[in-house]
Amino acid sequence: MAAGAGARPAPRWVKALGEPLSAAQLRRLEDHRYSAAGESLFEPPLQLFWTWLLQWIPLWIAPNTITLFGLAINLFTTLVLIFYCPTVTEEAPYWTYLLCALGLFIYQSLDAIDGKQARRTNSCSPLGELFDHGCDSLSTVFMAIGASIAVRLGTHPDWLFFCSFVGMFMFYCAHWQTYVSGVLRFGRVDVTEIQVALVIVFLLSTFGGAMMWDYTIPILEIKLKILPVLGVVGGLIFSCSNYFHVILHGGVGKNGSTIAGTSVLSPGLHIGLIIILAIMIYKKSATNVFEKHPCLYTLMFGCVFAKVAQKLVIAHMTKSELYLQDTVFIGPGLLFLDQYFNNFIDEYVVLWIAMVITSFDMMIYFSSLCLQISRHLHLSIFKTSYQQAPEQVHKHID
């Protein structure tokens, strides 16, 4: 059956999740084509490995299954590290860092071949693109936490905060410029290079111990752990200069607007609100909630970021306006109100409540979004069928 020929009736439990997209958005989604440009430094040699790896993947395994399996491994290995280092100041057993290096490498490899599997099985679709970016948004949060733990960055709370949120900001900006230009652009130094660098950091902590990052470099008189932080700062400047060059030079819409015909600056409100709330709550906390519970704090705001990033991706795919109002901000709002009323309830308790609210809100939204799209396009999320939608990919190398 052709995509868009009429959605299958939704089961009652699916209807309870809600349907995030309107009929008009679903119609525009049918016309969406994935468009990417650019090639990073490490991509050509790694393509050889990814192509070799693909031949071992059976045709009956769906691309989204590959993506989800990789994400699950990455999340599990990082959660093990968080268990041993909840304040990002502890030193975990050596094998946990090795596990994280392996988990991140597996995630990177599977994330790279899911699209190849989709083209191989003729199952490319907007659903696969959304699912891939949705998983990436969550993985971005966990990678930042894992890397911070590996170098014991909790001894420098301000740098820890910066490194915890800079990855979210850069991921959002990448899709912000896509929303403006209609093309996902990869720089010479991009996510692949970042992931390789993080694998190296995990391996160094495996064989040298996390305490090695406290070594003071002679002459410079700075700790070794500051070097990767400075690398992050350099990456931020380099990447964001490229992103904002695209954003500020006008979009493909009418009068230089976004692909949806809205202001090119409008998506900045969403990531700006997340970062402003995170900074305010961090700095105004009477109980030092971020310093004492940095992993939980980052995960809570990470869930907020993941949902907002997912909304930005689907706004691009459906050529729709991105609205600021969202229930996912209830979690940070509770922390903000608790501080306003002089911590009427213990901040740690409120942080856990916020974590539960934001994580469920994000997962329900993403699940309902995928289910609605799968019904409308007559696709299976975790099954491969040669009768699925035709390939919807356009890629050109600058």
UniProtKB/Swiss-Prot annotation:
<keyword id="KW-0594">Phospholipid biosynthesis</keyword>
<comment type="similarity">
    <text>Belongs to the CDP-alcohol phosphatidyltransferase class-I family.</text>
</comment>
<feature type="transmembrane region" description="Helical; Name=4">
    <location>
        <begin position="161"/>
        <end position="179"/>
    </location>
</feature>
<keyword id="KW-0444">Lipid biosynthesis</keyword>
<keyword id="KW-1133">Transmembrane helix</keyword>
<dbReference type="InterPro" id="IPR048254">
    <property type="entry name" value="CDP_ALCOHOL_P_TRANSF_CS"/>
</dbReference>
<feature type="binding site">
    <location>
        <position position="111"/>
    </location>
    <ligand>
        <name>Mg(2+) 2</name>
    </ligand>
</feature>
<dbReference type="GO" id="GO:0005789">
    <property type="term" value="C:endoplasmic reticulum membrane"/>
</dbReference>
<feature type="binding site">
    <location>
        <position position="64"/>
    </location>
    <ligand>
        <name>CDP-choline</name>
    </ligand>
</feature>
<feature type="binding site">
    <location>
        <position position="119"/>
    </location>
    <ligand>
        <name>CDP-choline</name>
    </ligand>
</feature>
<feature type="topological domain" description="Lumenal">
    <location>
        <begin position="208"/>
        <end position="222"/>
    </location>
</feature>
<feature type="transmembrane region" description="Helical; Name=3">
    <location>
        <begin position="126"/>
        <end position="150"/>
    </location>
</feature>
<feature type="transmembrane region" description="Helical; Name=9">
    <location>
        <begin position="330"/>
        <end position="339"/>
    </location>
</feature>
<feature type="transmembrane region" description="Helical; Name=2">
    <location>
        <begin position="94"/>
        <end position="118"/>
    </location>
</feature>
<keyword id="KW-0464">Manganese</keyword>
<feature type="topological domain" description="Cytoplasmic">
    <location>
        <begin position="180"/>
        <end position="190"/>
    </location>
</feature>
<feature type="modified residue" description="N-acetylalanine">
    <location>
        <position position="2"/>
    </location>
</feature>
<dbReference type="GO" id="GO:0016780">
    <property type="term" value="F:phosphotransferase activity, for other substituted phosphate groups"/>
</dbReference>
<feature type="transmembrane region" description="Helical; Name=8">
    <location>
        <begin position="294"/>
        <end position="316"/>
    </location>
</feature>
<dbReference type="InterPro" id="IPR000462">
    <property type="entry name" value="CDP-OH_P_trans"/>
</dbReference>
<feature type="site" description="Increases basicity of active site His">
    <location>
        <position position="129"/>
    </location>
</feature>
<keyword id="KW-0443">Lipid metabolism</keyword>
<feature type="transmembrane region" description="Helical; Name=6">
    <location>
        <begin position="223"/>
        <end position="248"/>
    </location>
</feature>
<keyword id="KW-0479">Metal-binding</keyword>
<feature type="topological domain" description="Cytoplasmic">
    <location>
        <begin position="119"/>
        <end position="125"/>
    </location>
</feature>
<feature type="topological domain" description="Lumenal">
    <location>
        <begin position="340"/>
        <end position="346"/>
    </location>
</feature>
<keyword id="KW-0812">Transmembrane</keyword>
<dbReference type="InterPro" id="IPR014472">
    <property type="entry name" value="CHOPT"/>
</dbReference>
<feature type="transmembrane region" description="Helical; Name=10">
    <location>
        <begin position="347"/>
        <end position="376"/>
    </location>
</feature>
<feature type="binding site">
    <location>
        <position position="111"/>
    </location>
    <ligand>
        <name>Mg(2+) 1</name>
    </ligand>
</feature>
<feature type="binding site">
    <location>
        <position position="132"/>
    </location>
    <ligand>
        <name>Mg(2+) 2</name>
    </ligand>
</feature>
<dbReference type="InterPro" id="IPR043130">
    <property type="entry name" value="CDP-OH_PTrfase_TM_dom"/>
</dbReference>
<feature type="active site" description="Proton acceptor">
    <location>
        <position position="133"/>
    </location>
</feature>
<keyword id="KW-0333">Golgi apparatus</keyword>
<feature type="topological domain" description="Cytoplasmic">
    <location>
        <begin position="2"/>
        <end position="62"/>
    </location>
</feature>
<feature type="topological domain" description="Cytoplasmic">
    <location>
        <begin position="377"/>
        <end position="398"/>
    </location>
</feature>
<feature type="transmembrane region" description="Helical; Name=1">
    <location>
        <begin position="63"/>
        <end position="83"/>
    </location>
</feature>
<dbReference type="GO" id="GO:0046872">
    <property type="term" value="F:metal ion binding"/>
</dbReference>
<dbReference type="GO" id="GO:0005794">
    <property type="term" value="C:Golgi apparatus"/>
</dbReference>
<feature type="binding site">
    <location>
        <position position="136"/>
    </location>
    <ligand>
        <name>Mg(2+) 2</name>
    </ligand>
</feature>
<feature type="topological domain" description="Lumenal">
    <location>
        <begin position="282"/>
        <end position="293"/>
    </location>
</feature>
<dbReference type="GO" id="GO:0004142">
    <property type="term" value="F:diacylglycerol cholinephosphotransferase activity"/>
</dbReference>
